[in-house]
Design a protein with these regions (language model features):
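N-terminal beta-loop-helix "entrance" segment that forms/cooperates
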Residues: 35-53
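N-terminal Rossmann-like dinucleotide-binding module
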Residues: 1-39
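A residue-level signal for conserved active-site and pocket-lining positions in enzyme catalytic cores
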Residues: 7, 29, 52, 82, ...
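Internal anion-binding site segments
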Residues: 198-311
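Amphipathic, non-transmembrane alpha-helical secondary structure
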Residues: 13, 17-21, 71-75, 92, ...
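Internal alpha/beta domain cores that form substrate/cofactor-binding pockets in large enzymes
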Residues: 2-4, 27-29, 58-77, 82, ...
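Structural motif corresponding to alpha-helix initiation and N-cap regions
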Residues: 13, 42-45, 67-71, 88, ...
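Donor/substrate-binding cores of folate-linked one-carbon enzymes
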Residues: 22, 32, 81-207, 211
Length: 311
């Protein structure tokens, strides 16, 4: 079976790796064009390109997916199937090209969390489970027929990074299984509507921007704690807070927290520092304990180290 693999970030590498290491016929890899990065604006390769170069795979990096030259090259490869993992929205002329279609790996239990940031939003919303889904591409984003699905638990100690890493491995295995059942003509793809009943509340996973990452100090301590977990380590929750001895608020990135539900008389949003060892923010129903943070121009550090540096 001739496979074209499409992906860009680290999350996609594990899926490509499992195919290459198990001798599946990957005839080409499609990834984003190189982008200038850093102070020197040096061109940076995607994680997928780095791996593809290492394995001497054919690499295509179209600026536009409807480019005639790119489409001609895709067609000449005569792929039986295309696999998409963390790439971009494909036009029909691309996803409809292979004889067996194109499937995508999505990091949620579809139809829940359609969109760009499913791992983050599942944790932010306090879900206890998530998973990975393979589905055939169609016109509407993340709505195609489900091929395979597997669940994992979201642990209280998890953040977006740990769930990302587990789903990356689980998803790679799901990609391999999906290719096998398609190759064996054993697919029983299910319409996503079969997973929706009258009391289903569909949650979305929209793209996260810097302003999305600001902590809402009017929420409960548990909600804020989950928000921090869901944004950690990337793109990172932040809040602006008045530090001791300062007249203007400082923006702090917050990577790790704990919380305590308790009645108190402190002003909401107030920072309370105890013996330069612990720091907590007063919220409406308790305290949010800051564990790992980053101040502007500083490295990421534990709260005790940060407090020792305050004057």
């Amino acid at each position: 079976m001739r496979i074209i693999f499409m992906g860009t970030p680290e999350f996609a590498v594990e899926s490509l790796k499992i195919l290459v290491e198990n001798n599946y016929e990957v005839v080409a890899v499609v990834t984003m064009p190189d982008k200038p990065a850093g102070r020197g604006h040096k061109l940076q390769y995607s994680a997928i390109k780095e791996y593809a170069l290492e394995k001497n795979l054919k690499i295509l990096q179209p600026e536009k997916l409807k480019d005639e030259g790119f489409l001609a090259e895709l067609s000449e490869l005569k792929a039986d199937i295309q696999v998409v993992v963390a790439f971009r929205m494909l036009p029909e002329v691309v996803w409809n090209m292979p004889r067996l279609g194109t499937f995508n790996l999505h990091a949620s239990l579809l139809p829940q969390y359609r969109g760009a940031a499913p791992i983050n939003w599942a944790i932010i919303n306090g879900d206890k489970q998530t998973g990975a889904t393979t589905f055939f591409l169609t016109h509407e984003i993340d709505t195609g027929k489900i091929i395979l699905q597997e669940k994992i638990d979201i642990l209280p100690t998890d953040n977006a990074g740990t769930v990302h890493d587990r789903l990356m491995v689980l998803g790679a295995e799901l990609v391999r299984k999906t290719i096998d059942i398609i190759n064996d003509n054993q697919v029983n793809a299910q319409d996503q509507n079969n997973h929706i009943n009258t009391d289903t509340v569909l949650k979305s996973a929209p793209k996260i921007f810097k302003e999305t990452c600001e902590i809402n100090l009017h929420q409960s301590v548990n909600e804020v704690h989950n928000f921090v977990r869901g944004m950690s380590p990337h793109p990172t929750a932040w809040t602006s807070i008045l530090l001791p001895g300062q007249t203007e608020k400082t923006i702090l990135k917050i990577y790790e927290t704990d919380f305590e539900v308790i009645n108190h008389s402190f002003e909401m949003g107030e920072l309370i520092i105890e013996e330069k060892k612990t720091a907590k923010i007063a919220l409406k129903d308790g305290f949010l304990y800051l564990k790992t943070i980053q101040a502007p121009g500083k490295k990421r550090m534990g709260i005790a180290e940060f407090l020792r540096g305050l004057r």
